[in-house]
Amino acid sequence: MNIIKALTDYRRRFPGEGDVIDRFERFLIDHDQVMDRNALPGHITACVWIRSYDQTKVLLMNHTKLGKWIQLGGHIEPGETPLEAAWREAREESGLTSLRLVDRGIYDLAIHQFPAIGNMPEHIHYDIRFLFEADGEEEPHNSPESVAVKWIDRDRLKEYTDDPSVIRLAEKG
């Protein structure tokens, strides 16, 4: 995946998100090891928005370290593209076997502060998010990254999170 080309395609699809795209592009220009999980002041992460096939439910995890409900995702391993990392994270963190990719293009972008944990100081996550679907009746499993992983009815999403970037994911589709 050529990230610059993917950002250009994303800009065409979501012209109202120019500010976040500009920040991503500036980060890519100014830094070398953008996918190294130890890179500071931040690094790119791969996330997945998983909705049920009938689009009535979304899959969220209660993140162990953050203590809040968010989409699944994580760090990009050496040699992986963001999309490959998204596939791996989706499988590892949900255990779902019915996963399918809806679109190879970027579905959403987000930039946020990640708190200091252990030896890693506070840093910035540049999330590249992809859209997946799965069978909403398939039972997900927890992973070491989560306290819980569960399907949530879309109309109840705000009972679990008030995070604007998660709400935006749901509003996109």
Task: State where each predicted segment sits.
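N-terminal strand-loop-strand
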Residues: 36-71
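Acidic, metal-coordinating catalytic segment for phosphate/diphosphate chemistry
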Residues: 11-47
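Glycine-rich, flexible loop/turn motifs
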Residues: 31, 40, 72, 110, ...
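Unchanged
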Residues: 77-165
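Aromatic- and glycine-enriched beta-alpha-beta binding-site module
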Residues: 60-88
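Cytochrome P450 catalytic domain signature, combining two hallmark sequence patches
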Residues: 167-169
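Generic N-terminal amphipathic, Lys/Arg-enriched alpha-helix
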Residues: 1-12
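Compositionally biased, intrinsically disordered linkers/stalks adjacent to structured regions
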Residues: 171-173
